[in-house]
Amino acid sequence: MRHGNGYRKLNRTASHRKAMFANMAASLIEHEQIVTTLPKAKEIRPIVEKLVTLGKRGDLHARRQAISAIRDVKLVAKLFDTLAARYATRNGGYIRIMKAGFRAGDNAPLAVVEFVERDVDAKGKADRARVEAEAAAEADAA
């Protein structure tokens, strides 16, 4: 019997839900910490945990499965190289969900989703690199 084995629909179609979870998983892998609503956080946990387990498996089939799930080759490379090595000795429990109060506009419960033992410098790394590149380009132009 499959009683109680459902999932949250989150008022979205199946394709929208699948795309949203793929985007959230990609953002979490890239930044290693995201802020979202609590129901979305609870739904994204098993998806990302399975992706990290695929990364730990490390073979070509696992890599192709991860690419089909998150659609970004650079993030899959990070998943298989950086994150898989970081969690090589840990059997599950790669994600932490912490309650973060309520959103101002609609009072929705918020949660911080982050990797356990995360790299603090990963959040905002692309933004910092972009700002430094723009500053260097301006210095060269001047």
UniProtKB/Swiss-Prot annotation:
Name the UniProt record assigns to this protein: Large ribosomal subunit protein bL17
Family: Belongs to the bacterial ribosomal protein bL17 family.
Species of the source: Brucella canis (strain ATCC 23365 / NCTC 10854 / RM-666)
Keyword Ribonucleoprotein tagged: yes
Keyword Ribonucleoprotein: yes
Source species, domain of life: Bacteria
Subunit-structure text: Part of the 50S ribosomal subunit. Contacts protein L32.
Keyword annotations from UniProtKB, A to Z: Ribonucleoprotein, Ribosomal protein
Disulfide bond entries: none
Entry GO MF terms: structural constituent of ribosome
GO CC annotations on file: cytosolic large ribosomal subunit
